[in-house]
């Protein structure tokens, strides 16, 4: 039995997304947000054809490095490795549906909210969520 929607090794740790959790959220028609690398996003899109993907870019590599150092959690070598991984991730940006730049957190968050709202308002999604109302109004 498949237990994970996607899994990946990142920074020496194994991460994954429980398929049961995703199915439960889907059953109650909840939007699901995943924080995954480009390979995870690719796996999710293969499993859920209507999934959308948003790539969150740093404003610059210098700013990303500053943020990693400010956390105070990683060694210099780990920070260098994370920056290298970030560059590799960014080389796959064209596979994503949307891009936002996380210069100011609240601005990036607002971008993400707008993207989700716009996707939910697409006709195909409204036809699913408001099927009875639409049928009643169009008959």
Model regions: which residues?
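Structural signal for short hydrophobic segments within the conserved structured cores
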Residues: 5-6, 52, 98
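Conserved catalytic network of the ASCE P-loop NTPase/AAA+ motor domain
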Residues: 24-27, 45-49, 91-93
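NTP-dependent small-molecule kinase module
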Residues: 73, 91-139
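Conserved AAA+ ATPase "sensor/coupling" helix adjacent to the nucleotide-binding pocket
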Residues: 1-5, 67-74, 115-118
């Amino acid at each position: 039995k498949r237990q994970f929607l996607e899994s990946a090794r990142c920074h020496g740790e194994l991460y994954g997304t429980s398929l049961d959790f995703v199915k439960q959220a889907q059953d109650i028609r909840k939007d699901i947000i995943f924080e995954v690398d480009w390979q995870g996003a690719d796996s999710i899109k293969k499993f859920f054809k209507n999934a959308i993907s948003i790539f969150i870019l740093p404003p610059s590599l210098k700013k990303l490095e500053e943020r990693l150092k400010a956390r105070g959690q990683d060694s210099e070598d780990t920070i260098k490795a994370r920056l290298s991984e970030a560059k590799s991730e960014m080389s796959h940006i064209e596979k994503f549906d949307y891009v936002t730049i996380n210069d100011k957190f609240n601005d990036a968050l607002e971008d993400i909210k707008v993207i989700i709202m716009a996707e939910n308002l697409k006709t195909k999604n409204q036809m699913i969520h408001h099927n009875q109302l639409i049928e009643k109004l169009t008959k």
